[in-house]
Design a protein with these regions (language model features):
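Non-catalytic, topology-defining segments of multipass membrane proteins
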Residues: 1-252, 297-428
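Pore-loop/selectivity-filter region of tetrameric P-loop cation channels
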Residues: 99, 104, 278-292
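Active-site-proximal inter-transmembrane loops
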Residues: 188-193, 261-287
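Interfacial helix-loop-helix junctions of multi-pass membrane proteins
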Residues: 257-262, 294-299
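Generic preference for hydrophobic/aromatic residues in regular secondary structure cores
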Residues: 235-237, 257, 264, 268
Length: 428
C-alpha cells in the first residue's frame, strides 16, 4: 500500500523504520509488521518496534552469539591462559583459507564464472567456504547474482538504499519478504560438488571450521607438554569463532562500506565504490566500482599497483594447470569507461565553476576570477580527453587495435584530467 492510498483509507502513513530505511521494500509487507500505530484519531505518535515476527532467529542467534563470544570470550581466554604462536598462526592460516575460498571460489569462480577451475580448487573453496558460515555456495551465488542484476533497487538482497545497517547485516537478521526462488543458478545446480556442499554445508562448517581448530589446539598443547584442554579451547575461540566473525564482517563491509565510501572512477550509474583499504582487508575485493562495471573479469584490481591477491592466485593456478579460461576485459574498454566518467564529472565541474558570480569586492572577486580560470583550464583538458574518447570508441566499434604507446598517452591524459578535477575543488 502506498502512502497516498493509505491516507485515502484513513490510515496514518508510517514513519521511517527504527534502524534501516525501507523506502520501497516496505510496500510489500503489512505496515503492522513493522510499526505499532496509536488508536485511530489519537494524537499519539507511532511507536517503532522491532518486527519480531520477521526476525531470522537462527541466523540472528548465530551472528550475534559468535560476535559476543569473540568480543568477550577471546579476551578472557587470552587474559587467563595467554596466546602462543601456534594459535596466531592457525588463526591467520584459517582466515586466509576462508577468505580466499569466498573471494576466489564463491565469488569469482561460482557467482561470476570469471574462470574455470579443476576439481581440487573447487573442493578446497567449497570446504573452506563453508567454514565462513555464509551459507552454501549455491545460496551465496544466487543472492550475489540478484545483487548485480538489481543493484540499488528493491530486489537487491543487500540494497544500500535501505541503509548501511541493512546492507551490512540487517538483510540477514530480518526476512521482510518471501525468499525468492533460486532460479538464477541453473548452471551451478548441474555441478555435483556444489550440490553436495549445499546439502552438507553446515556440517562441513562445524567440523572443519570449529571442531578441527579445537582438535589441532588440543594436539599441539599435548605435544608441547601443556594443558591440552587449554589448547582446544584456544583453537575453538581464536581460529574458530573469532576467525568466523572477522571473515564474515570483511565480506559484509563489501556490501555496505564499498557502496558508501570511496571513489567511482568507472561509473556512477550504481553506488559501488573503489576502496584500497577494503581491498587490503578483503583479498582484493575492495575495487568494487570496477567490479560492478565489469563483473565477469577475474580481476578486481586491474592497475599494477592495486592489491588483489585473489587475482594473483587465480593467475598462478592457471600457470600450474588448475585454472583456465580466465576472462578479462580489454584495456581499451576499461580506459573508455574511465574517460567517460572523467568527462562527465569534468563537464559538471566546469558548469559549477562558471556559475560562480563575479563580485566587485576584493577577495570575493579574486576567488571568482580564479574559479573561472580553473574552469577554462579544465575545459582545455577535457576537450583533449573528449577527442581521445571518440577515437577510442570508434576503434572499439571497428575492432581496430591501438598501439600501447597511444593507449599509454591517453591513460596519462585521462589521469591528468582526474587530477585537475581534484585540484579544482580548491575553488568555489
Amino acid at each position: 500500500m502506498t502512502r497516498g492510498t493509505a491516507e485515502k483509507a484513513g490510515l496514518h502513513p508510517p514513519d521511517p523504520p527504527f534502524i534501516y530505511r525501507l523506502p520501497t521494500a516496505s510496500r510489500r509487507i503489512p505496515p503492522a509488521a513493522l510499526f505499532h500505530n496509536g488508536p485511530k484519531g489519537s494524537s499519539t505518535k507511532p511507536m517503532h518496534r522491532i518486527p519480531f515476527d520477521r526476525v531470522n532467529w537462527i541466523t540472528s542467534s548465530f551472528l550475534i552469539g559468535t560476535a559476543l563470544i569473540a568480543l568477550i570470550g577471546v579476551p578472557i581466554y587470552v587474559f587467563n591462559f595467554g596466546i602462543d604462536l601456534f594459535q596466531v598462526t592457525m588463526f591467520f592460516l584459517y582466515l586466509c583459507a576462508t577468505m580466499m575460498s569466498i573471494t576466489l571460489g564463491y565469488h569469482r569462480l561460482f557467482s561470476h564464472i570469471s574462470f574455470k577451475a579443476k576439481w581440487p580448487v573447487k573442493v578446497f573453496t567449497l570446504v573452506f567456504g563453508a567454514c565462513a558460515f555464509e551459507n552454501s555456495c549455491l545460496d551465496w551465488s544466487s543472492d550475489h547474482r540478484r545483487h548485480h542484476k538489481h543493484v540499488d533497487h528493491d530486489d537487491d538482497p543487500y540494497d544500500i538504499s535501505k541503509g548501511f545497517f541493512w546492507a551490512h547485516i540487517g538483510w540477514l537478521l530480518f526476512k521482510l519478504n518471501p525468499e525468492p526462488p533460486m532460479d538464477n543458478v541453473a548452471d551451478l545446480k548441474k555441478d555435483k560438488l556444489v550440490m553436495l556442499q549445499h546439502k552438507y554445508v553446515h556440517w562441513i562448517g562445524l567440523v572443519v571450521g570449529l571442531i578441527l581448530p579445537a582438535v589441532l589446539g588440543y594436539a599441539w598443547n599435548h605435544f608441547m607438554g601443556m594443558n591440552p584442554w587449554h589448547g582446544a579451547l584456544g583453537g575453538f575461540l581464536i581460529a574458530g569463532v573469532a576467525r568466523v566473525v572477522v571473515a564474515q564482517h570483511c565480506t559484509f563491509f563489501i556490501n555496505s562500506l564499498c557502496h558508501t565510501v570511496g571513489r567511482q572512477p568507472y561509473s556512477t550509474k550504481h553506488s559501488a565504490r573503489d576502496s584500497a583499504i577494503m581491498a587490503f582487508l578483503t583479498f582484493g575485493e575492495g575495487y568494487h566500482n570496477y567490479h560492478h562495471e565489469f563483473q565477469h573479469d577475474y580481476r578486481n584490481g586491474v592497475k599494477p599497483w592495486q592489491w588483489d591477491p585473489t587475482k594473483w592466485t587465480i593467475w598462478a593456478l592457471s600457470k600450474v594447470g588448475l585454472a583456465e579460461g580466465l576472462r578479462r576485459v580489454p584495456d581499451a574498454k576499461i580506459l573508455l569507461a574511465e574517460m567517460h566518467e572523467a568527462r562527465r564529472r569534468a563537464h559538471a565541474r566546469i558548469e559549477e565553476l562558471r556559475a560562480t558570480p563575479i563580485s566587485e569586492h576584493g577577495m570575493a572577486q579574486r576567488a571568482a576570477e580564479a574559479a573561472h580560470r580553473a574552469a577554462d583550464a579544465l575545459h582545455e583538458v577535457v576537450e583533449q580527453v573528449s577527442k581521445n574518447y571518440h577515437e577510442l570508441e570508434k576503434s572499439i566499434s571497428e575492432r581496430v587495435q591501438l598501439s600501447r604507446e597511444v593507449m599509454r598517452e591517453w591513460q596519462l591524459e585521462t589521469r591528468a584530467l582526474v587530477r585537475q578535477l581534484r585540484e579544482s575543488h580548491a575553488f568555489a
